[in-house]
Structure formats: structure tokens, C-alpha cells
């Protein structure tokens, strides 16, 4: 497809998640949504029972403000949090824009900073951020952190280097697989 919606593997999407991203997609923009979180007890129960009906009222959901779906006021927040670093757990963009920045920088090890590097390079390309608050709701399942401090330190150095040099197209990305 021409449009990519990206999530993490440890989230539960609201039933309108995909529809919300598609309805907000505009040329020249990438979209960023927020996420609510699920505590450990509720996460275990959901994974055992397989019943994923959640809302901001569900006991065990926190960051409840991020679990509110209010599409009629979402557009008021499109330019909200313009300076905040994005995360890759709830982001969408045009495939052509992803290819122009050479996708994710594969010099990153594990996770950490790779998902803020991509949107930073999209911005340097001239693609603007649109925040989709109160739409594209997702719930992050509780788990222990997997990244090591060494990986995070290495990744932070790569991210800072990309920023300092104004890198738009990363040196090791998706092109190596499609050329």
C-alpha cells in the first residue's frame, strides 16, 4: 500500500484505530497518536482470557486521558505537542516519505531512540507532524523493559549524531533490501 500505519507488537488497538489513521492521512504530514497503558494485573488477565474490550473507564487502564476517543474535537489538537519527540508505537506516514529518508536506521541496536529518529528525519525532509489526540486509541500491555543501558547509550549517540549532522537519509536503511 501507499500508506503505512505502524504499531508496536505489545499494544491493543481500539476498534477504530486503523479507520482513524486513514481518515486523518494528508500528503505532506505524518500522524502521531498517544497511548494509554494497562497495568500488570489487567495485562495478564487480558492475555489469558482474550477479551480485549477496553475503555478509559476500565480498571487497570492508566493515562486515561489517552484512552478517550472524542473524534469531534480531535482536529483542535492537530498542532498540539509539536516539539515533543514522537514514538513509533502509534505513527503513520506515506510510503514515499519513508523511502525518501531510507526507512529506519539499522545502526540502532534493539529498541530505543530509533523510533524518535525516524520522525526527526521526516521533519528535516519537510514532512509535518499532525497529532491525532482523541483518535487512534491504543493500550500498551505491561511488560518489563528489554533494552540494556549499553544499547540505549549507543542508540542515543547515533540519534544525537544524526541530529547534529542534519541527516535526512540514513546510511543503513531500507534501500539495501529494495535496490
Predicted regions and their residues:
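C-terminal catalytic/acceptor-binding lobe
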Residues: 107-179
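Acidic metal-phosphate-binding loop of nucleotide-sugar-dependent transferases
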Residues: 10-12
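Active-site acidic Asp-centered loop
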Residues: 7-8, 34
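A recurrent flexible, glycine/aromatic-enriched loop bordering the glycosyltransferase active site
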Residues: 62-93
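Short, well-ordered alpha-helical scaffold segment located
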Residues: 96-100
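Conserved donor NDP-sugar-binding/catalytic core segment of glycosyltransferases
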Residues: 16-53
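Short aromatic/hydrophobic "clamp" motif used to bind/position activated sugar donors
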Residues: 4
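Conserved nucleotide-sugar donor-binding catalytic segment
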Residues: 92, 102-110
Amino acid at each position: 500500500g501507499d500508506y503505512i500505519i505502524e504499531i508496536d507488537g505489545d499494544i491493543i488497538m481500539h476498534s477504530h484505530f486503523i479507520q482513524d489513521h486513514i481518515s486523518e492521512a494528508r500528503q505532506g504530514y505524518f500522524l502521531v497518536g498517544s497511548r494509554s497503558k494497562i497495568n500488570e494485573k489487567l495485562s495478564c488477565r487480558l492475555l489469558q482470557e482474550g477479551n480485549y474490550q477496553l475503555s478509559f473507564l476500565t480498571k487497570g487502564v492508566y493515562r486515561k486521558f489517552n484512552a478517550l476517543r472524542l473524534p469531534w474535537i480531535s482536529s483542535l489538537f492537530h498542532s498540539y505537542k509539536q516539539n515533543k519527540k514522537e514514538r513509533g508505537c502509534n505513527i503513520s506516514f506515506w510510503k514515499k516519505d519513508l523511502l525518501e529518508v531510507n526507512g529506519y536506521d539499522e545502526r540502532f541496536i534493539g529498541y530505543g531512540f530509533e523510533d524518535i529518529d525516524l520522525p526527526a528525519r521526516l521533519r528535516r525532509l519537510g514532512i509535518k507532524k499532525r497529532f491525532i489526540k482523541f483518535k487512534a486509541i491504543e493500550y500498551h500491555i505491561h511488560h518489563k523493559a528489554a533494552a540494556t543501558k549499553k544499547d540505549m547509550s549507543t542508540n542515543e549517540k547515533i540519534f544525537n549524531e544524526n541530529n547534529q549532522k542534519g541527516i535526512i537519509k540514513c546510511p543503513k536503511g531500507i534501500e539495501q533490501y529494495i535496490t
